[in-house]
Design a protein with these regions (language model features):
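Classical Sec-dependent N-terminal signal peptides that target proteins to the secretory pathway
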Residues: 1-22, 33
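Detector for repetitive beta-architecture
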Residues: 57, 75, 81-83, 104, ...
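Extracellular beta-rich repeat passengers
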Residues: 347, 396-398
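Solvent-exposed adhesion/ligand-recognition segments of exported proteins
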Residues: 20-277, 283-284
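Intrinsically disordered, low-complexity Ser/Thr- and acidic-rich flexible linkers and loops
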Residues: 247, 347, 351, 357-365, ...
Length: 424
């Protein structure tokens, strides 16, 4: 590998100011030199993989007392050749990869951990684009546009801080992207329903999320957090907000707070989220559009959980599982549109582990037939509402005190439930 000195003009981001900084001594190789730049404050290094010189191999920073390797970058891209995070010597439990100065991270290949499996975090306030990206030898994966927060007292990762607004002075720090693209996570994947999942256990933490096409597929949970400036992952901890003297005196523009799942002109059966465990969406002050299919094959009563706070959810597609839990509070609104369907795939009631039972039929029943959910819980506050203009089918419907006042069914031909139960 050739080593050369490079002078890169970067931008340091704070909520109120930005300044230029000179960075020296990047390790250089013509195959990936424009893909991975290690920040000067990071002890990680990068080299070409011995068996594939087109592939970058990152020798990660030493771990702290809690097993966290914290790596900082000025640029972090992954081509279809993939990238390796070498964890053989460090044996970290969590590998944080934070882009502190740089453009949106473009992930088009596999991100593999060599050595001990670990939780891999990719954090970039400028956004992340996953185009058929995947992970291997990971315990779980976190894609976030927030800044990881480490507790200085005990070295633990306690959560992420996200920006809900941006000052006009600061917009140049985001590579000239329009404001509706800042802090955005975009997925664009193949229509792939195979048993080979791209993720093991996926966490998506961003206030601006879009699935353009295809599926986000995870072996375990898919957990989405949106709409908050602070996301706590360590119970009992808190993130202290940093105050900036100029902040209150500078006009700030609010960043979008939205989740768009699928192309509204696409086939809902060929895009969406697929999990063998749970799909959980935690959203506050967010507008959500589902044009795809949210599918869980877990047998839990809460296989798909929508925890909505001051949030609007417009379901144009499918929500399919044995059990669903909708928690609506503080003026939240769930609208199951005319094209929306909430139920259970017929194959899930056959005891089969997946829907690849036959090409077209399960016995004499078409494979894509939708039957009633086993359990659907609608925990709706007095100031929140659910309106159904599509199809909702469940055997047991659980509500507060068997109350249906906040549930409006506009489909007289659809009997939502067989049995009405009280939430225990």
């Amino acid at each position: 590998m050739k080593l050369r000195n490079a002078i890169i003009i970067g931008v340091i981001y704070t909520p109120s100011i930005c300044q230029a900084v000179v960075q020296y001594n990047y390790e250089y190789d013509k195959h990936y030199s424009n893909l991975v730049f290690i920040n000067q404050d990071s002890s990680a290094t990068v080299k070409p993989n011995e068996t594939n010189h087109n592939q970058a191999e990152i020798l990660i920073a030493p771990k702290n007392s809690k097993g966290i390797s914290y790596n900082k970058y000025d640029r972090f891209h992954v081509t279809d050749a993939g990238i390796i995070l070498n964890n053989k010597e460090v044996a970290a439990e969590t590998i944080i990869n934070e882009v502190v100065n740089g453009a949106t991270s473009l992930l088009s290949g596999n991100i593999a951990v060599a050595g001990n499996a670990a939780h891999v975090v990719i954090a970039n306030p400028n956004g992340i684009e996953c185009h058929n990206c995947s992970f291997s030898n990971t315990l779980q994966e976190t894609l976030t546009t927030g800044k990881p927060v480490i507790n200085n007292n005990n070295d633990e990762l306690i959560g992420y801080r996200l920006e809900g607004s941006i000052s006009s002075l600061n917009e140049t720090a985001f590579s000239g992207n329009p404001i509706d693209y800042i802090g955005k996570i975009v997925f664009s994947n193949e229509n792939n329903r195979s048993s080979s999942h791209s993720f093991n256990k996926l966490n998506i933490i961003s206030n601006n999320i879009k699935l353009e096409n295809g599926f986000i597929s995870s072996k375990k949970d898919i957990i989405i957090h949106s709409g908050k400036e602070e996301v706590i992952i360590k119970e009992g901890e808190s993130i202290l907000k940093q105050e900036y003297a100029m902040r209150s005196n500078i006009k700030r523009d609010n960043l979008p707070s939205q989740i768009i799942l699928g192309d509204k002109n696409g086939d809902p059966k060929k895009q969406g989220l697929i999990s063998s465990k749970n799909i959980i969406i935690n959203a506050s002050d967010t507008t959500i559009y589902n044009y795809g299919s949210l599918e869980s094959s877990n047998r839990s009563k809460n296989a798909i959980q929508l925890n909505l706070n001051k949030t609007i959810f417009n379901n144009h597609g499918y929500i399919l599982a044995r059990g669903g839990y909708l928690d609506l509070k503080n003026g939240s609104f769930f609208h199951n549109m005319e094209s929306g369907t909430i139920g259970m795939p017929y194959w899930l009631n056959t005891g089969k582990t997946n829907n690849i039972y036959s090409g077209i039929y399960i016995g004499l029943i078409p494979k894509d037939t939708i039957s009633r959910m086993k359990n659907l819980t609608l925990n709706i506050s007095e100031d929140s509402n659910l309106i159904n203009d599509g199809i909702i089918m469940t055997e047991r419907l659980h509500t507060r005190d068997k109350n249906m006042n906040n549930i409006q069914n506009n489909r007289e031909d659809i009997k939502i439930y067989t049995k009405l139960r009280k939430i225990k």
